[in-house]
Structures are given as C-alpha cells and as structure tokens.
Design a protein with these regions (language model features):
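Sec-dependent N-terminal signal peptides
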Residues: 3-13
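A domain-start/cap signature at the N-terminus of enzymes
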Residues: 17-110, 182-194, 356, 360-367
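Gly/Ser-rich "nucleophile elbow"/oxyanion-hole loop immediately N-terminal to the catalytic nucleophile
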Residues: 104-107, 151-189
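Loop/turn elements at helix/coil->beta-strand transitions in domains of secreted/extracellular proteins
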Residues: 106-111, 136-141, 175-179, 198-204, ...
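Active-site machinery of serine-nucleophile hydrolases
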Residues: 110-111, 117-160
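Cell-envelope and extracellular/periplasmic
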Residues: 115-118, 167-170, 184-186, 195, ...
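The feature captures the conserved acid-bearing segment of alpha/beta-hydrolase catalytic domains
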Residues: 202-280
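Alpha/beta-hydrolase-fold serine-hydrolase catalytic core, especially in secreted/extracellular enzymes
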Residues: 256-257, 265-367
Length: 367
C-alpha cells in the first residue's frame, strides 16, 4: 500500500473546540470492490441459496437468474488473495476516509460507519446525527471511492483503517468499538454483507437498496436490520415491489431475522429530511438494547447483548396493493395476531410506535 496523504484538523469552534476530524486518502486497487469479486472469484457460481422466494407468485427463476440473486457468498481471505494473484489487482483509484469524534467522547462507545455512496456523504455531516453522537459518545466514520463504497473485500480493510485512525486521533478504542453500519443504494453491499461477517455490528441500515437481494444474508439474521424502500423508487419496482419486500420477508421466515422494513410513500431513490428521524430512532434503540451501558472498548472486544425474537414487537407489513400512507398494526410478539413469521420485527414498543407513525404519517414528530 502506497504512503497515504493525511490531513488532520481540530475544529476550533466556540462551542466544541476539541472535536477531532481526520481525513485520509488512499489509492486502492479495484480487486477490493464487490464487482471485481463477483467477476473474478467463484462466488458468482455458488448456490448457497437458490434465489426462489415464492414460486406461486413469481414462478421459478432460471438457473442464471437464481445465481445472480444469491449474494450469500462463501469466500475466505485466502481464496480472495489467490484470485488477486491469478487475475491481478486491477487499476487503482482514490478512496477517501473521514473520521469525526466529538469532544464529549473521551472514550468512544461505538462507531457509526457509513459508505459515502449516495446519501452517506450528507449523513456524515447531519447535525442531528452529530448531536446523537455527542450524547451517546459515538465516533463517525465514512469512506467513499469505487474500490470500497459499494462493499469491499476483505473485511479486514475497514478494521485496519479504524485502528490507524484510532492511533492518530489518540482514540485507541476505535480498534474494538461496536459498529453501526449505513449503506444507501448499492452501498447495501457494505452494510448488509459486512454485517454477515462481523460480531462487532450492533445494527445496520439499507437505505433504498439498489439490489435488494444483497440483503439476503442469513449470517446477519440476528443483528437488527432496517431496510427502507421509497414507494416510487424505480429500483423498488424491479422486478416488482412485492418481490423486493419478499426478500426481507423470506429472511424473517426462513432465518428468524431480527429485521424490519419500511416503505416511505411518495418518495424515490433518495432519502429526505423526514427519513432521517426514522434512521436515528433505529440507531438509538438498537444501541441501547445491544451495547452494554458500561462498555469500555479500551479494554478489548465488546460482547454485545444478544436479542431474542420473543423479546420484541411485530408490525404488519405495508400493503403493496393499497400503497401510500397506511396505519399498520403493531403488538408485542406474544399478542400479535398477524403472520408472525414474516411481520417486521421491532425492537421494543417505543420503536414500534415510531415505525407505525412513520408508515401512517410519513414522518416521526415526537422528540
């Protein structure tokens, strides 16, 4: 890896003079990107899952279509390294990394990590997210650049950057702090697929997945996940809205996934101002439920709280035939009367109320 260019700046403002912001730009080869991995390793031919959701609704996909729908890859770092040796690492491109640590976080209890693909750039700078980070003592970390922003291999690439940034920021806890992941569109190739391999992740978000089949990750089933679709997003309509929702419902039914999804009415492929409170509610509630209150990543790896299906609430899924804003029933797991196997899993009653309000009103108005 070539020597990198590092810019470090203390944000000298009247209110928060000790906030830390670090920026680093590296040139990385394209062999790290998921596109290269699909094209140059054996994962494209794997059949860990056949891609069939409901033959009664959509028929049996062709063998080629089924393989293309399977993103549940089994690829070791050694196999990836061998493929790079045989095929070459490809051209190099810039990848920019940014870290922000609030003054209040003398020890960061967690890191919100986001791909800068799409809306990730704006999320990193969002005032409300930074307010939450100050309150919960979280660091924010972002990366953008073709070798990584749509997902990457190997997973250690992120861990290496977090460790390096932790050393330079004098926040060594970044080497072990729990992670919350965000990916927009095909940035889902980061947030969903990375979650399947990391015991450090306390929750993850896929915002308007470009390819919804990327979220079919059985190994991530027990990590709380949120998928948000835009009702008029062209990607949501391919091949159909029902089939895209069906990917999440299949994970719920086949793997008891602790996941929920929402459909934001009258919106397209990008989130808006009313979308972010939905994400922030999920971040807050999952952090409280999974990250121990006395966590200290300076002492090493953090053991996150495991959650059970029965401990949460359930919510009736959005009706694609009705469309628009809908009042969807929620109830504790034991008393929910709908289809428990496919309903959205909601971490607690307070989060369930936010989920319900968002689907009914298109926004969360409580504070």
């Amino acid at each position: 890896m070539k020597p990198f260019y590092l810019v470090a700046a203390l944000l000298l403002t009247n209110l928060h003079a000790a906030d830390i912001e670090l920026t680093e730009t590296l040139q990385l080869p394209e062999c790290h990107s998921l596109g290269w991995v699909r094209a140059n390793t054996q994962v494209k031919g794997q059949k860990n899952w056949d891609g069939v959701l409901d033959e009664a609704k959509w028929g049996t996909p062709s063998p080629q279509q089924a393989v293309e729908r399977s993103w549940d890859w089994k690829l070791t770092d050694e196999q990836w390294q061998q493929a790079v040796k045989e095929k070459g690492e490809g051209k190099k491109e810039d990848v920019k990394f940014d870290l922000w640590v609030p003054e209040e976080a003398t020890v960061a209890k967690g890191i919100v990590v986001m791909s800068g693909h799409g809306s990730g750039e704006n999320l990193f700078k969002h005032p409300e997210l930074r307010k939450i980070a100050r309150e919960l003592h979280l660091a924010l970390f972002k990366f953008v650049g073709n070798p990584m922003q749509r997902g990457f291999w190997p997973r250690s690439l992120l861990y290496e950057r977090l460790k390096t940034f932790g050393q330079r920021a004098q926040h060594a806890e970044l080497d072990h702090a729990p992670l919350f992941l965000y990916g927009h569109s095909n940035g889902t190739g980061f947030s969903a697929i990375f979650s399947a391999e990391s015991t450090r992740v306390w929750g993850w978000v896929s915002m308007r997945p470009g390819t919804t089949y990327q979220v079919y990750q059985p190994s991530a089933a027990q990590i709380p996940g949120l998928i948000i679709f835009g009702e008029v997003d062209d990607f949501f309509g391919r091949p159909s809205k029902a089939e895209n929702m069906g990917v999440v419902e299949a994970m719920r039914k086949k793997h008891n996934a602790l996941w929920n999804y929402a459909v934001e009415p009258k919106t397209g492929h990008g989130p808006g101002d009313k979308t972010w409170p939905r994400v922030f509610s999920f971040l807050r509630h999952t952090f409280a439920a999974r990250v121990p209150a006395d966590t200290d990543p300076l002492k090493g790896a953090v053991k996150l709280h495991a959650l059970t299906l029965e401990s949460g609430s359930l919510g009736k899924n959005w009706d694609v035939t009705q469309g628009g804003y809908q009042t969807l029933t929620t109830a504790p797991f034991a008393s929910f009367t709908g289809d428990k196997s496919t309903a959205s899993w909601l971490i607690n009653p307070a989060y369930a109320a936010d989920w319900q309000m968002f689907q009914r009103d298109g926004q969360i108005t409580r504070h």
